[in-house]
Structures are given as C-alpha cells and as structure tokens.
Amino acid sequence: MIRQATTPRAKLRFYNACRGKLCLGATMPLALELLGKSQPGRFFAGPTLALDIGGSTAWMAGHANPEELAGFLTFCGCSAVVLDEAEAAPPAGWTRARSHTIFGLTPGRQLPEPEADEALWASLTFDRDPPARPVAEALFPARPARRDDFYSELCTKRSRGRARVWALWQGKTLACTVGAYALANGQAYMACGETAEPLRGRGIGGRLIVRLANELSAEGFQPVFLCAPERVHFYTRLGFEKLGEYARYEAPAK
C-alpha cells in the first residue's frame, strides 16, 4: 500500500528506499526533510518505495507492484515517472520515453579547467551567492508557477546550507548560472546550468560547472547530476564520469 510519508514509519520507508541512490539519494530525502510539513501531499512511501510527486513528473526510488504503481500515479495526475530500471519495473502499460545519464565526480578528484573565451570570461563578474529571484527568472522565464516554486525552495535550502548557487554577471544581466541544489548524504546534486543565449558556445558555462564541481569535490562531496541524451557529449568532454542511468516512463495517451 502506497501512503503519504507523514508518519515516522512511512518516513523511514521513504529514507530507506532512497539510501545509496545516486542523485535521488540526495534530492528526495532533502525535499522530504525541508518540505514534508508544508507539502504533505507531495511525498509517498510503500514498503520498498519512495515517491516525490511535486508536479506532473514523479521521482521514484525503490520498487512497487507495477499495476498498483500505474494506478496510483494516474490517480495523482502524473504523466511521467523517473526510475531506476535496475531495481524497479515500470508502471504497467507505461512507455519508456528517454534515458537520463548519471554523471559525477569522485570526491577529492579535480577536473582540469576547460577552455573558454578568455576575453569574455574576464569581462564577467563572478558571484558566489547571487540573489535567488534573478536566478529563478533566468531559468524559468515563461513558467511563472515553476519559477515561484523554485525561488521558494532555493531560499529554504540556502538558509539551511543545503544549496550552493554560482553566477556570472554581464553588467546587470545574469550571463550564466549553475548550482548544487541538494547538498545531502555526501552528495552534491548539480542542476540548472544555464547560459544566456547570445553567450552560448564560448565555454563559460562549462568552466563554471567544473569550478563548482571541483570546489564541492575538494570539500568531500560527490558531485552528481542527471543528463539528457543530447548533453552526454558535453559532460563527457568536461571529464565527468558516467556512473549510471535512470529512465523516464510516460503514461499512455488518453
């Protein structure tokens, strides 16, 4: 039976299902810890299952009966789920849509700094602690609801030392940003690397990513992130290690 992760027993099941999972072992327990009271309808657990349903895509650690899982996700209004095929069968009747490659860096290892347009790099201002609002606006310019949720969660995580975001400014314009949005359980889950469109292809994003990953690694964290298929070559070129793969499954068309 899948239930809300609100009781001590359900929370323990949730944490146990996430334990040792790359990426999900940082993001999901941290989200439950910080947001479980304010968003109790977002987190669910089964005997060997953890689910984070913060939107139309569910994030899943562990495993459950495929028929029960399909029915539950449909009831919750989910159209997709990300899971580890090595341990979980997909929801019954759902279709595999794409892979998410897990990249990372062994704690203590340092990557060489990638090439970049040095004149452009020198003209930008590095910001170790940019305001959350312009970061949210740069990442989600056309999705106001997602932007507001992101802003709120980032502020909550930062206030507790559980997130680290860097940025480069070109005057008063945010030129590039990347962050570690879940510092938990020895992992640093990196995400939301974004460069302003006119400046893309000049190396500043890759350099900022590597610098942040190197700093986190030197502090003993394992930097990890999920990568879409079209970005695999980019992160491979930067020197990150491929550590595994998750799969995205989508519900049948109605």
Predicted segments, located by residue:
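N-terminal charged segments
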Residues: 1-88
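Short amphipathic alpha-helix that is part of the acyltransferase structural core
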Residues: 1-28, 99-103, 107-152
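A conserved beta-turn-beta hairpin within the catalytic core of GNAT-like acetyltransferases
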Residues: 53-60, 182-191, 200
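Acyl-donor-binding surface of acyltransferase catalytic domains
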Residues: 53-130, 227, 249-251
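Conserved acetyl-CoA-binding loop-helix of GNAT-fold acetyltransferases
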Residues: 65-72, 191, 195, 201-218, ...
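Conserved acetyl-CoA-binding loop of GNAT-fold acetyltransferases
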Residues: 92-97, 236-246
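A conserved beta-strand-loop-helix scaffold within acyl/acetyltransferase catalytic domains
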Residues: 146-194
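Conserved hydrophobic beta-strand within the GNAT/NAT acetyltransferase core sheet
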Residues: 190, 223-227
